[in-house]
Swiss-Prot record:
Domain of life from the UniProt record: Bacteria
Binding site for Mg(2+) 2: D217, E389, E393
Gene name, Swiss-Prot/TrEMBL: ilvC
Residues annotated to bind Mg(2+) 1: D217, E221
Protein name, per record: Ketol-acid reductoisomerase (NADP(+))
Length: 494
């Protein structure tokens, strides 16, 4: 199979990368009706598989799960997930032939094998659904021409898909139809009904493309969403320990600080996050973030380039073929870092203290979001897609760090995201350690400025505020957040 994106000419590539339209709520007036009375069979019952299935069933759809016979015989976790929630479970041979829509929600590395197995069993004119387009775009999977291929991609982990639905809301979602597989012209109707069945239409749906979803998703998760949190946690912890800050306090400041800081992002963007700082701290965070952007821009652009060309995917798939030797080795190394093993403490850190003593963390967030957004849009990805794959998802990923440090983040994200995270963090960590952290002190990470006055020059503050507010990620973010007025706090235990 050849990389699908690389088979397109330049005009086609740019067209696919630039597909993104915020759909009007009126386009979902019939909600999930198009799929009612039809048989939906989900392959895979992990976090996305189970929670999307629960939502779809509650929306009136006929949902069952097709699992490998071995998973059924051995009653593996996927089987238990489905059966304990009252779903019908059967083998591929039992359920796939009667399915009108087969939804493949298995891990990326299993997609080729799964699709090659189920496709011969699918009835003529059925539809095949994905929630991530890697198999189509990067692996170039060829789907039978009578099959309609669609995507519904919620922009958050599966557990959040369910929780937001239960609140009567939903999560922002991308939908797409594969241009090579829409024989009856009803791909969009299928995708719209599926998205509505998960509740996504209540939070906002972007009509996108398989290409735009994959390229932007890979870029976001490798850099700001995961890689920057991992690299930042490691180097900031090292700095605080080296300068005599208590290990328990240092670890807690980072583990829970990312979540607290990025929650401000979710509600008011970078502007609101920076406004949580005192004026002197805001100016300092701005200066640090400008330095970070200059230092890290080449690394962000390199990752974007490798994603666009397919170099990243081919490298990762080679590791798949080698029994994940690199992935597993990097996972073990991460588990041995000092931050992952800091001693638990019962020290209480008030919310504002995470900002006051985490000025560098704020700077890293601002720099990382803007760099990822800029790299994506410079490559032809439209601003709405770039926003969702950078700023919007960051609080959700930071929440996983708050639960069980980097281990939890890497467990929750896909293997594809985890592999890309390590590629980025393995370069970003020594880069920050050697070229940046030597010039900062614990006044920006761990202790705070300790200023006695909030005074800064008017001219400086005006420049800082105007620069922050005029960045394209802030402008598009303000518009998109307007569609999500019913957001909840994501903090652990809240």
């Amino acid at each position: 199979m050849a990389n699908y994106f690389n088979t397109l000419n330049l005009r086609q590539q740019l067209d696919q990368l630039g597909r993104c339209r915020f759909m009007d709520r009126n386009e979902f007036a019939t909600e999930a009706d198009y799929l009612k009375g039809k048989k939906v069979v989900i392959v895979g019952c992990g976090a996305q598989g189970l929670n999307q299935g629960l939502n779809m069933r509650d929306s009136g759809l006929d949902v069952s799960y097709a699992l490998r016979q071995a998973a059924i015989d051995e009653q593996r976790q996927s089987y238990k997930n489905a059966k304990e929630n009252g779903f019908d479970v059967g083998s591929y041979e039992q359920l796939i032939p009667i399915a009108d829509l087969v939804v493949n929600l298995t891990p990326d590395k299993q997609h080729s094998n799964v699709v090659e197995t189920v496709m011969p069993l699918m009835k003529e004119g059925a539809a095949l659904g994905y929630s991530h387009g890697f198999n189509i775009v990067e692996e170039g999977m060829q789907i039978r021409k009578d099959i309609t291929v669609v995507m519904v991609a919620p922009k958050c982990p599966g557990t959040e898909v369910r929780e937001e639905y239960k609140r009567g809301f939903g999560v922002p979602t991308l939908i797409a139809v594969h241009p090579e597989n829409d024989p009856k012209g009803d791909g969009q109707e299928i995708a719209k009904a599926w998205a509505a069945a998960t509740g996504g239409h209540r939070a906002g749906v972007l009509e996108s493309s398989f290409v735009a979803e994959v390229k932007s998703d890979l870029m976001g998760e490798q850099t700001i969403l995961c890689g920057m949190l991992q690299a930042g946690s490691i180097v900031c912890y090292e700095k605080m320990i080296a300068d005599g800050i208590d290990a328990g306090y240092a670890g807690k400041l980072l583990q829970y600080g990312w979540e607290t800081i990025t929650e401000a992002l979710k509600f008011g963007g970078i502007t609101h996050m920076m406004d949580r700082l005192s004026n002197p701290a805001k100016v300092k965070a701005f200066e640090l973030s400008e330095e970070l952007k200059d230092l890290m821009r080449p690394l962000y652009n390199k990752h974007m380039d490798n994603i666009i060309t397919g170099h990243f995917s081919s490298t990762m798939m080679a590791d798949w073929a080698n029994d994940d030797v690199n992935l597993l080795g990097w996972r073990e190394e991460t588990g041995e870092t000092a931050f992952e093993n800091y001693p638990v403490t019962d020290v209480e850190i008030p919310e504002q203290e995470y900002f006051d003593n985490g000025i560098l963390m704020v700077a890293m967030v601002r720099a990382g979001v803007e760099l990822a957004f800029e790299a994506m849009t410079a490559s032809g990805i439209v601003e709405e897609s770039a926003y969702y794959e950078s700023l919007h998802e960051l609080p959700l990923i930071a929440n996983t760090v708050a639960r069980k440090r980097l281990y939890e983040m890497n467990v929750v994200i896909s293997d594809t995201a985890e592999y890309g995270n390590y590629l980025f963090a393995n370069v970003a960590t020594p880069l920050l350690r050697e070229k940046f952290m030597t010039d900062v002190d614990t006044d920006v990470i761990g202790r705070g400025l300790g200023e006695v006055s909030n005074q800064v020059s008017n001219e400086t503050l005006i420049v800082v505020n105007e620069t922050l507010r005029s960045h394209p990620v802030e402008l598009v973010g303000q518009e998109l957040r307007g569609y999500m007025t019913d957001m909840k706090r994501i903090a652990v235990g809240d």
